[in-house]
């Protein structure tokens, strides 16, 4: 949620922006968790990577929040609305004939999570549990 209300122009633009933010967040969640899994296999723990990200140009409120959840493995058990918003955004992109391959892959990851009952959490928990499943590791808390 943003800190202020912004006028985004014509009627319908707010829905476009809402879905765009969900699409951006979905790719960000999945990519950060994927990178953490790869680094862990290489011997670098998530806490160290969190420190690196926090002290880099990639630092943001979003990356700090995602990395804190990845490190703590304390996932909020709740329904995530992100997959629904991403799906709506992809539908709009198809209608506009705009290819969205990264967002499409993130959406497919959410679909895999749903099919394997890994979707009962907020987005970071979904991503972490899904990547644990893919990598044959024990799922985190949840």
Model-derived segments and spans:
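Ligand/cofactor pocket segment of small-molecule handling proteins
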Residues: 1-18
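A charged, well-structured terminal subsegment
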Residues: 4-8, 81, 86, 140-142
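Helical "substrate-binding/catalytic lid" subdomain
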Residues: 14-133
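Hydrophobic alpha-helical segments
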Residues: 131-142
